[in-house]
Amino acid sequence: YPSPKKAEERFIGYLLNTLRSGEIDVLFPVADACLKPIVDHEEEILRYTRIALPPRDIFTAGYDKGTTLRIAMENGIPCPRTFFPESPDDAAGIAEKIDYPAVVKPRVSSGRRGVRVCRDSQDLVQAYAASASEFGPVVIQEFIPYGGELGVYTLLNAQSEPRAVTVQRRIRSYPISGGASTLRETIKDERSREAVGIALRLLKAMRWSGVAMVEFRVDARDGSLKLMEVNPRFWGSLNLSILSGVDFPYLLYRMVMDGDIEPVPDYREGVQCRWLLPGDILWYLSAPKTWQNLKAFLR
């Protein structure tokens, strides 16, 4: 189909032509590039099918990292110290008072695109100019030293009540310095329960419905959880959630069709899933060549 990034109107036209058959019960947007065009044209699309996303005003709260962080700060959700520059002068002023390293992050982007770690004020001002030019509005944040990462994977009904939750921890990533996870594991412990409580409180404040992943980093300085972002769509490690006993796509389909579902009471812990090609192979090739790493990779 036409690229939603390079030819949005053609993409929407193609989509509407496909939906006019009346044979599609629910539209599931699963790629970042498709999300905003579909939300922007929701009135046209809703003539032919249902959309497995929250309404436009609520969707923006998860799609725009700046909006997410403002809601988090207003509701006492632990997150990095964050600034919202609106001009180069704002960025220069922030650069003089923030501690380093600091992070410049686009408010709307996928993965680590446009994210820059800055070592001094000159670096930050240059990073702001580059990111703002390519991606639009950005946030500037304190850097949180990496002590681990947890993801809370959720399905909420129209009243923002949880219907399914799983928690995963990141074991390996590529690049090692920070990137896509190559090995993850479902967990249940005191830290994961804390993360679930914080995530559900945030999503309630956002009035969220549908699926969302809430990402936390463990602050290596004190072991506390810090909100990194909310992913307003299905996540890359979705198969791990399904293998642990929670079929999020089917549950979301049933909820969109029926209005609500019974809560899923539990999931299996200790289930692992890895992205072997090329992710985990690249991790191994870039990791220190130790017996422990070889043994872990071959398990």
Over which residues does each language-model region extend?
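A short, GP-enriched loop/loop-strand-helix hinge that lies immediately N-terminal to
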Residues: Y1-P2, G22-Y63, P78-F83
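Glycine-rich, highly charged phosphate/nucleotide-binding loops
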Residues: Y1-T18
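Phosphate- and divalent-cation-binding pockets in alpha/beta enzyme and binding domains
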Residues: K36-P37, G93, Q126, G151
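Active-site nucleotide/adenylate-binding loops and adjacent lid/helix of ATP-dependent enzymes
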Residues: F59-Y146, A158-P162, E190-G197
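ATP-dependent carboxylate/phosphate-activation module, predominantly the ATP-grasp catalytic core
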Residues: Q122, A129, E142-R207, N231-V256
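Protein kinase-like catalytic core scaffold
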Residues: R163, A212, S224-E229
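A short glycine-rich, hydrophobically flanked beta-strand micro-motif that places a catalytic Asp/Glu
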Residues: S209-R221
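Peripheral (often C-terminal) accessory segments that flank ATP-dependent C-N-forming ligase machineries
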Residues: R254-R299
